[in-house]
Amino acid sequence: MRVAEVVRNTSETQIRVKLDLDGTGRQKLATGVPFLDHMLDQIARHGLIDLEVEAHGDTHIDDHHTVEDVGITLGQAVAKAVGDKKGIRRYGHSYVPLDEALSRVVIDFSGRPGLEFHVPFTRARIGTFDVDLSIEFFRGFVNHAGVTLHIDNLRGINAHHQLETVFKAFGRALRAAVELDERAAGQIPSTKGSL
């Protein structure tokens, strides 16, 4: 079973993430940031990852620490669940549309953290959610999952649609990358023999 649970406590946030990479998309989300819960739901459902996230943060100041630290903790949990990476496909990509919006996400479980985030948001907030926090979420994730991640919103007018297509595509790309390949069972997906 490729499951993991990570607890991260700081003076700003207390976060618990539990996941099963071979799940069915079940989720239990309580971050204190409703729009983040909505986006995490997209990852779970489209990634077919069973996901529990519980967070308590200093949201009386703003949502920054909570969103960033959830990304960090999710990255740690994914890295733990993937383990030595033997037999995974390593790469994943997905294009996802939602009405006028279209996003592409490409991921590589390379062991080298890197983020290219290109989303020309059409407004600064989605409800009360600051769209810049999505960058902090993904930066936290890549730095702690050890992945290279390219995110491009190719078109979109509605900022909610722009970000929702990003998270849906991320879930689907993640699912593809961590999928086990029977033909490569027990093998590290690299000519170097390590990742």
Swiss-Prot record:
Pathway field: Amino-acid biosynthesis; L-histidine biosynthesis; L-histidine from 5-phospho-alpha-D-ribose 1-diphosphate: step 6/9
Reaction it catalyzes: D-erythro-1-(imidazol-4-yl)glycerol 3-phosphate = 3-(imidazol-4-yl)-2-oxopropyl phosphate + H2O
Keyword Lyase: yes
Subcellular location: Cytoplasm
Stored PANTHER family: IMIDAZOLEGLYCEROL-PHOSPHATE DEHYDRATASE, IMIDAZOLEGLYCEROL-PHOSPHATE DEHYDRATASE HIS7
Gene Ontology biological process: L-histidine biosynthetic process
Family that this chain belongs to: Belongs to the imidazoleglycerol-phosphate dehydratase family.
Gene3D superfamilies according to UniProt: Imidazole glycerol phosphate dehydratase, domain 1
NCBIfam families cross-referenced by the UniProt entry: PRK00951.1-1, PRK00951.1-5, PRK00951.2-1, PRK00951.2-4
EC number annotated for this UniProt entry: 4.2.1.19
InterPro entries per the UniProt record, alphabetical: IGPD_sf, ImidazoleglycerolP_deHydtase, ImidazoleglycerP_deHydtase_CS, Ribosomal_Su5_D2-typ_SF
A GO molecular-function annotation: imidazoleglycerol-phosphate dehydratase activity
GO CC, any one term: cytoplasm
Cytoplasm found in the keyword field: yes
Keyword annotations of the record: Amino-acid biosynthesis, Cytoplasm, Histidine biosynthesis, Lyase
Group of enzyme by EC: lyase
Name of the protein described by the UniProt record: Imidazoleglycerol-phosphate dehydratase
